[in-house]
Structures are given as structure tokens and as C-alpha cells.
């Protein structure tokens, strides 16, 4: 909370002034820090202090604001004079400050949305939470959701959010040992629910079904009923809001296959390849690991009657496998499996850890398909979001191995040396290739005393003299600048 010092002549401000209000700044504990006069202008909130410069908060920099009985609070952004923070002021006219600020926001064409805050009753003192999202339209008496349906009347205090959304890290929560007396920060025991804003024409056409529930807690529908309800639903009651999410596009495809082939609706730990095929005429869905690409004879096996699946079979299969792949085991587990795989490198068995293109042993992907996904996102609250893989075949490790085997080093190449015989230089030497040892360095010659006869002798002094003579030649083209280095022409 911001700390503000004493006020500017509080007695001179009448109690019913339209734009000036007597306020007292409080901290997280509700302790009064100082008093002042809060003034609402056409563009900013001004706090007048005694013998100090006034503090200003432009309306465009306010993230959210609200009131509760005799407490007015707001959250400022990073561009304000005070920086980012939450400020609370006690005032008997807190509701008037809120309403006036709401009107000024709308007059300045600032997008203001009201957020419903639903608080469950508990034994602790009533506290309210600052909402973390702003996706509801403006309202004064009845909160409303983004899809146009009216919500339940707000039992708690009212909060409005400015266009900028703060991050969750910007909200200040009291320490575990604190018991805040001012109703601004909420505890972890309180539940708050919000409705996501749908975007796009498809979401607008498929609006949520809104079904009011009687008072009291209503348990979630069973998982079997959730699978039959294809559209997301929102259940409202005065105390809280219940959500039932619809299946994902990948889940819809699985449900379509299950509706076509009843044998697909097996227990969660049932293998697709082990069950009897009771409906051979219907298309069958097969799941496999496709992290390295689809192999021949695997993937989606559909009948020719499914014309819509012919062009997008690989793409939809990849989407299904991407969402339903189990998490990989830790890398350190591959060290134990690697020791077992090194023993079988000489044979043709596939129990080793020679990785394929996708990091798993070759020839085993079709034998251990993944578990069928049977849970939707509605049941993900109590279950894992990834299916559990089936029991792996004995002797066939499925651990991802990053130690890709590389071919051994190539044998060193042999270098052939030949000696050139110069005329008049010593005796004749035999011609022909000589193959030294494999070490790469030439071996010792049989005649070390005559090894210098095979090379030409360069006269370094003569070479330097010829170079100096060439540089000293005169240049009469007129383009060379005369310096002390080339001004003297040496005779040829």
C-alpha cells in the first residue's frame, strides 16, 4: 500500500463536495498512515497532501479499482508517478468515488469492464480477491458475462478493471502469519471463477448452454455423462459457477471412431490389438508412436468409403498422437539399458538399444501401441492429462537413448612417396612407390647421408639480390610519387 502523509485543510472541503473527498490512507494491516483530499478531475486522480506535492494517477494508467463499504482501493500501473502498487483509502463516500470514477472513465472512452467476484462463506473475516482477468462488459447493478447472459447479483464488493491487465506477480498477498483487517487481499481458501471469452464466428455460433442450478452444491456430472455431452456447459448458482468443458477436436475424432466401432469402447487399460474385432466392416483406429514419422502398414487404417479422411489421414493421426503421447522416462535410465544392449550388438536380436530415427529401438513400434484416450478435459481435474502406457514387452527396452551409435573410425590411408632423381646429383636412386608403415609418418630412409640429394638447393642471397633489383627499377609513367625510398634510380 502507498503511504501518504497528512492532508491539505480537510476542514475547508465540504462533506458533499462533488469531486473532492476526504480520505485516509491505510496499509495492509488496516493501520491509518495519513489523511488527505482525493480529487477526481477529467483526466486523473489527484491526492492533495499537506506541505507536499500532490500525487497524480492518470485514468489511463489505472489497472483496476473498486470499493467495499467505507474503503476505496485501486491498482496503479508502472507508468504512474508512484509506480506499480495497490492503494487503499478509507472514506465514508467510497461508493460515490467509485461511481464518479466510473462515469469519468466512460466519458474519456476508456474501456471499463466490471468483474463479478464470488466469495464463499467461511469462519474467517470476509475478504475479497482482486480479479485477475477482465472479460466482462460494463454493468452497475447486475454482473454479466461476456456471452451476454446475466449473472447472479454480486454479493461481494464491486471491482472494475481498466484496459491493461496486470500479471499475477503484480498482486501483493499478505504473508502467511498475517490476518489482514482491511478487506482487500484474499486468502487461498476462497474460490473465484470466471468465464473465458469466446472468439471467432465458430465460438459465437456454438454458445454455451446456460442452466441455472438450485441453491447448494451440485456435484459434477459423472464421466459417462460428460462423454455424451458434446458442447461445453456453464452452470450458475448464487454461490459459485460450475464449468463443463467440451471435448477437444482430437477427442471428437476418437469419439467418432468409438461411435462407428463399439469394440473401441474398452476399459482404459485394454490393448487395441488384443481385443477381438467384432465389427470388421467398420473402420478401425490404430495408435502408434509417430515421433519419428509414420511407417508403412501402420497409422490410420480406414475404409475407402471415408472420403473425407483420405487427404488428411496423416495430419489428423499426427495430431492425435501428439496429444496422447506419454511423457518420456528420465534420460539416466538409459544407462542401465545401454549395458544390456552392448551385449547383443554382434547378433541380430532387437533387444539392444540401437535407436531408430525417432530415438526408440527399431521394429517395436507396432507391437506396443499407446493406450486409448478415454478421459476428456472435464475429468482431467482428478486424473492425469496423459494416458499411462501399457506394460512393455519383456526384453525390449523402450527408454529413449541419446547415445546414437556412430560407425568406427576409418582405417588410416597409406601414403605413397616417390623420389625424383636429378641429373648430376649423386648416384642414381631406384624409382617406384614406397609404402611406409601405417602410422602416417614416413619411415627412416635407408641412406640418411644421401637423402639431401633428392631436393633442390635454393640460394637465398641470390634470391634477395634479384628481388631488390626488381624493386629498384625506374618507373617513368608519372603516376608514382617520388619519396626517399624510390627517388634514386639504380643502374641496371
UniProtKB/Swiss-Prot annotation:
Phosphorylated on tyrosine residues upon stimulation by BFGF or NGFB. A lipid is attached at residue 2 (N-myristoyl glycine). InterPro entries: Docking_Protein_DOK (IPR050996), FRS2_PTB (IPR038742), IRS_PTB (IPR002404), PH-like_dom_sf (IPR011993). Residues 125-205, 337-413, 425-492 are annotated as: Disordered. The keyword Metal-binding does not apply. It is a lipid-anchor. Residues 133-147, 166-185 have a biased composition (Polar residues). Gene3D superfamilies: Pleckstrin-homology domain (PH domain)/Phosphotyrosine-binding domain (PTB) (2.30.29.30). Residues 13-115 form the IRS-type PTB domain. One of its GO terms (cellular component) is plasma membrane. One of its GO terms (biological process) is fibroblast growth factor receptor signaling pathway. GO terms for molecular function: fibroblast growth factor receptor binding; identical protein binding; transmembrane receptor protein tyrosine kinase adaptor activity. PROSITE patterns: IRS_PTB. Transmembrane segments: none annotated. It is found in: Membrane. The keyword Phosphoprotein applies. PANTHER family: DOCKING PROTEIN RELATED (PTHR21258), FIBROBLAST GROWTH FACTOR RECEPTOR SUBSTRATE 3 (PTHR21258:SF39). Adapter protein that links FGF and NGF receptors to downstream signaling pathways. Involved in the activation of MAP kinases. Down-regulates ERK2 signaling by interfering with the phosphorylation and nuclear translocation of ERK2. Binds NTRK1, FGFR1, NGFR, GRB2, PTPN11 and ERK2. This is Fibroblast growth factor receptor substrate 3.
Amino acid at each position: 500500500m502507498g503511504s501518504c502523509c497528512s492532508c491539505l485543510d480537510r476542514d475547508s472541503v465540504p462533506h458533499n463536495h462533488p469531486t473532492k473527498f476526504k480520505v485516509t490512507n491505510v496499509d495492509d494491516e488496516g493501520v491509518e498512515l495519513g489523511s488527505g483530499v482525493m480529487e477526481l478531475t477529467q483526466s486523473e486522480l489527484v491526492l492533495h497532501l499537506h506541505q507536499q506535492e500532490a500525487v497524480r494517477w492518470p485514468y489511463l494508467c489505472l489497472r483496476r479499482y473498486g470499493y467495499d463499504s467505507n474503503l476505496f482501493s485501486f491498482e496503479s500501473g508502472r507508468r504512474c508517478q508512484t509506480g506499480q502498487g495497490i492503494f487503499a483509502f478509507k472514506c465514508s463516500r467510497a461508493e460515490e468515488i467509485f461511481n464518479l470514477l466510473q462515469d469519468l472513465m466512460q466519458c474519456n472512452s476508456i474501456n471499463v469492464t466490471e468483474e463479478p467476484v464470488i466469495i464463499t462463506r467461511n469462519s474467517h473475516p470476509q475478504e475479497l480477491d482482486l480479479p485477475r482477468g477482465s472479460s466482462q462488459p460494463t454493468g452497475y447493478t447486475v454482473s454479466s458475462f461476456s456471452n451476454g447472459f446475466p449473472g447472479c447479483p454480486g454479493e461481494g464488493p464491486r471491482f472494475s478493471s481498466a484496459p491493461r491487465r496486470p500479471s499475477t506477480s503484480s498482486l501483493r498477498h499478505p504473508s502467511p502469519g498475517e490476518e489482514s483487517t482491511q478487506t482487500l487481499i484474499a486468502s487461498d481458501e476462497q474460490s473465484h471463477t470466471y468465464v473465458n471469452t469466446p472468439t471467432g464466428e465458430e465460438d459465437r455460433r456454438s454458445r454455451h448452454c446456460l442452466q441455472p442450478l438450485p441453491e447448494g452444491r451440485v456435484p459434477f456430472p459423472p464421466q459417462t455423462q460428460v462423454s455424451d455431452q458434446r458442447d461445453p456447459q456453464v452452470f450458475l448458482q448464487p454461490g459459485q459457477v460450475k464449468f463443463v468443458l467440451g471435448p477437444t477436436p482430437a477427442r471428437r475424432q476418437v469419439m467418432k471412431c468409438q461411435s462407428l466401432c463399439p469394440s473401441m469402447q474398452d476399459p482404459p487399460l485394454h490393448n487395441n490389438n488384443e481385443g477381438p474385432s467384432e465389427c470388421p466392416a467398420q473402420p478401425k483406429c490404430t495408435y502408434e508412436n509417430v515421433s519419428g514419422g509414420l511407417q508403412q502398414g501402420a497409422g490410420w487404417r480406414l475404409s475407402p468409403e471415408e472420403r473425407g479422411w483420405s487427404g488428411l489421414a496423416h495430419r489428423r493421426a499426427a495430431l492425435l498422437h501428439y496429444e496422447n503421447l506419454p511423457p518420456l522416462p528420465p534420460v539416466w535410465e538409459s544407462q542401465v539399458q545401454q549395458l544390456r544392449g552392448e551385449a547383443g550388438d554382434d547378433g541380430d536380436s532387437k533387444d539392444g538399444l540401437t535407436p531408430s530415427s525417432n530415438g526408440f529401438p527399431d521394429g517395436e513400434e507396432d507391437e506396443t501401441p499407446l493406450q486409448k484416450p478415454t478421459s476428456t478435459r472435464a475429468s482431467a481435474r482428478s486424473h492425469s492429462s496423459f494416458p499411462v502406457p501399457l506394460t512393455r514387452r519383456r526384453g525390449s527396452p523402450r527408454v529413449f537413448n541419446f547415445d546414437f551409435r556412430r560407425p568406427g573410425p576409418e582405417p588410416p590411408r597409406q601414403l605413397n612417396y616417390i623420389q625424383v632423381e636429378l641429373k648430376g646429383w649423386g648416384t642414381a636412386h631406384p624409382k617406384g612407390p614406397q609404402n611406409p608403415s601405417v602410422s602416417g609418418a614416413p619411415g627412416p630412409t635407408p641412406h640418411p647421408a644421401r637423402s639431401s640429394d633428392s631436393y633442390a638447393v635454393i640460394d637465398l642471397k641470390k634470391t634477395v639480390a634479384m628481388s631488390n633489383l626488381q624493386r629498384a627499377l625506374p618507373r617513368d609513367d608519372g603516376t608514382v610519387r617520388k619519396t626517399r625510398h624510390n627517388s634514386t634510380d639504380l643502374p641496371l
